[in-house]
Structure formats: C-alpha cells, structure tokens
C-alpha cells in the first residue's frame, strides 16, 4: 500500500519561478562543468535549490538542507522538471558546489555580470543611476596562524569601534531606484575603501554595456584618479567632496 504524505507549498513556487526567470542555472552551468564522474544534478541546478532553501528557511546551514529537500522533493520536481535524488543535497555535495563556484574570483564576477545582464534585459530595468558603497563586518574569530591580513579576515578601521575584532569588507553596486544588485565583492579587513570604487564602476559598465549612467557614491569615490577615469571614459559621477578634495 502506497504511503501518502503532505508537502507544504508556501512561497516555493514563487521563489523557484523567479530563480528560473533570472536564469541562474544556465548562467552557472555555462561557466562551471562538473567532473565527469559527478552524478545527479548539475552545479547550476544544485545552486537553484540551495538559494531556494536559504530564502525559504532563512538559514544557510548545510547540514539541514538534505532533510528540507526531501520534505519538499515532489513539489520541487514538479516546479523544476528535474529528477531529484534522495541524496542530492547532502552537506558534502552542497559544500563542494559552493567551494567550486566561490574559489575563482574571475569566474564569480563573470556569473554576476551574466545574471545582471539577464535581469536588465528581462525586466527592462532602468540603468540611469547606479550606486556603490562598502561596509565592514566584525567577527569573533581567532587570529589566523599565518597572521591577520593574510586572508579575508584582518584588523582594520572599524565602523563598529571594535579595533580588537577581525573584520572583512563587502561592497555592493545596485541600480536605482529598485535597488537591484549588479555587483558585489568581498575584500580583506585591512583593505582601504578608496581603491574599490573605480574597479566596481568598471565592472558595472561591462554589465550594463555602456558608461552613460550616473555613478552615485560617497566621498571615498572622490579620489582624483577615480573621477578622472570615469570622466575620460564618458561616464558621470555624483560624489560628495571632502575638504581635502575641494581644491582638486
């Protein structure tokens, strides 16, 4: 006698629909191909399921995803059209997928660029104004054996006034007024903010396809090199000038 069970639907159809519309799977699978002996879903398919899991459960704990996936497996198979095995989402498989996607910065930037272009084209998003800003995140962590500053975590100027804590920095470029993210980058805690603004602008130019947008940023983007380069490449910027830059 077959067993019957109930699977909750909730917001999963909406989440999967938008991830499909953004073509996340196609963008990832075009850049990363799994090992020939890799079985089951592709990296792109696993990534879609992982993002759906994070958005649905509001957690990113890998150890719980296998049970979550199996409790929604029939629904997810209907929504995606994929055959999802019972062991597709073990923590080692998901961890391997995340490691592969995150270990090469150049490919990760290509992914951001492709997804950003898909969003702009699919929804005809306005690209007249783009914002970029950075922030720091303090963490309770032991100092790495090779010393602070050798990796992402390091000591630096803390906006939280906690010079005793290690930190890393995160930058985000987004479209106004919708706030749609186009570019993000993670850098080491000791890194200064000023040198990040020009590479971020150049990357968003590649994503949008031209430089004819207004680049809005804070005074750390007011360095003469940053402003001169944007102007030379026919771009526009709107930044606040500190006292040191008013005469430059």
Language-model region placement:
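Short beta-strand-initiation
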Residues: 167-169, 223
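An internal, acidic/charged active-site-proximal segment
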Residues: 192-248
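Short, solvent-exposed loop/turn segments at the edges of secondary structure
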Residues: 165-167, 232
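Dynamic "connector" segments at or just before major functional cores
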Residues: 1-152, 164, 171-190, 198
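Carboxylate/His-rich catalytic cores and anion/metal-binding grooves
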Residues: 157-161
